[in-house]
Structure formats: C-alpha cells, structure tokens
Amino acid sequence: MFFPELPVILHKRLRQPQAADMEDHHMKLVECIPNYSEGRDEAKIAAIAACVKETPGCALLDIQKDATHNRCVLTFVGSPEAVEEACVKTAKKAEELIDLRFHKGAHPRMGAVDVIPFVPAMDMSLEECVALSKKVAERIWEEAGIPSFLYEASATRPERRNLADCRRGEFEGMPEKLLQEDWAPDYGTRAIHPTAGITAIGARNPLIAFNVNLDTDNVEIAKSIARAIRASNGGFRSCKAIGLKLEDRNIAQVSMNLVNYEDTSIVMVFEMIRALADRFGVRIIGSELVGLTPAKALLDCAEYYLKLENFSAKQQVMEYHLIDLESGDAGNE
C-alpha cells in the first residue's frame, strides 16, 4: 500500500532484521488505529502510548487527542504478531486507567478501548486482518475481561458491520442492549466490563476521519447536514457522519469518516457541507483531519482551499514519517 522502499525505511523503528532479510521474507505489515476514551489526562494517554513504544516490532506513528471529544487515537504499524501484542497491552492499560462511569465527552463511546481497527499495510490481505482481529478480541476478553463486537469486514452478522450500530446505546445503555437476542457479544458474556465497557474490533480498509466546524452553536444544524450527506440516509456512498456540539468552543461540528476516499473525496463532502450550511445562513469556519491521512487523498486539496485548522503535513501525513525514518531523523518520542 505504501511503496517498495518501506522495509528499508522501517527496519530501524520496528527493531526487525536488516532490510535485505525482510525483503527475502516478504515482510508483512498491518496498521492499527485504536481509539481510547481519554483525551484530557496526559499521563494516562502517555501510559497507553508507552505500551506500543515498548513493543518490539511496532512503530508508533501518531497520537491524536481531543479534550472536547475526550478521546485519543493512536496510529501504529508493525508485524501482525507485534501489533497483536501492542493491542492487548494497551487494552489492559486502558482497563486499568479509564473508568467510563465518570467519562464525559462529545463523541459517542461504549468502551475504554472504544474501537480497534486493523488495516492492511503491506503484504497483508483484508482476510488476514480479519483473522488478527479475532485473535485480539479473544485475548482482550481472556486477559482484560472486556467483551467485544466484531465489526466491518470481521462482522459475524450484517447488523454489526456498521460501527455506529454496534455503539448505539453507548456505555450507559449497553447492559440492556446485550440482553437483546441479536446483541450478544462475539467474545465475552452478556455483560459489559463494569468500568471499561465493551469494544468494537475489526478489519477494514483505510478511511479518513474529517471534521468540519460551523459558526453556529445550534447542533441541530450540524445533525441535519450529517443526515443529508451520510450513506445511511441516501447521501455519499462512502460517508459516515454525525453532528456534534463542541462545548468548549460553543460551535457545532459535522464529524465524518470517509471509508473510501477514492469514491467519496474530502472535496466532495466539504463542498456539499458548504452548500447545505449556506441554506441555514451558516459558514464553515474550519476543518480538521484526525490521525494520519494518505497523501493521495490530499493531493487535490490545497490547504488554503479547505481552511484546515492546525494541520501539519509533517505530523499528520504518513509518508512524512516514513521519510524521516529513512533519513534517521525520527525515533520513538
């Protein structure tokens, strides 16, 4: 998915054998982008991230945190075996540190580790990522006592493919949901972990997390726009969207996942949101990308055109990290 020089670039960070040996063995890489329900406590976020940094064979590429959503997202890449270990370690650390009974944030959530997606990176198939997701789900149940739903390509039932359907009810409503006939966890018993809730785990293709901020405090406008553009309501085929209120900024936000950026581009949704916002007499005041984004998705999106807030190509585009690794300028932070 990246480029042929990837083994050479990554071998130092991944603490693997020399690049030539890796090429001979057709090195497999998987990307993992778990979301944790903590975006305010720096010490807790650092402790979770340390579980990845300390795992041989893993490279932690990015940490995104948001106090309003009270959520953080790690992006790391490594061999399937290393990524499995890192995922289980972070889940156990999140179970230790995060208590959802006291969690408040703008973003929907059902677990301390809310979602764990696996994405094929190099010489990995989606089917192999599905198998990995099941191994991780089983271990997180056995070692941390956290049940899980399998979602996206790993889903065992059609209604579990969509993350939003799995998460509906959130932490507070999940005990009752698990008692429904169709909603027993794929791993674990029909009871959430008392403080860490339940996790969604699955394999998927790359997506872009893209948010657009509006100059209004009326969250109903953001929700109306989200309904119009998301696939489930007849909007863009590869767009998932919700409307949120950012209390600390007193503005509304359209928060999106673009699950196939070749099919539904950033520009397409941005322009549609602009047009719909105009109908309400509302302007776009900024946008943001959450986590790492494929460079290809940004080639047609000039920074000034999208009014990106706090965007740093150096920090948020995966290829820049890989270039730094090749030059020896970057290391684990």
Task: List each model region and its residues.
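Hydrophobic alpha-helical signal peptides and transmembrane signal-/tail-anchor segments
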Residues: 1-2
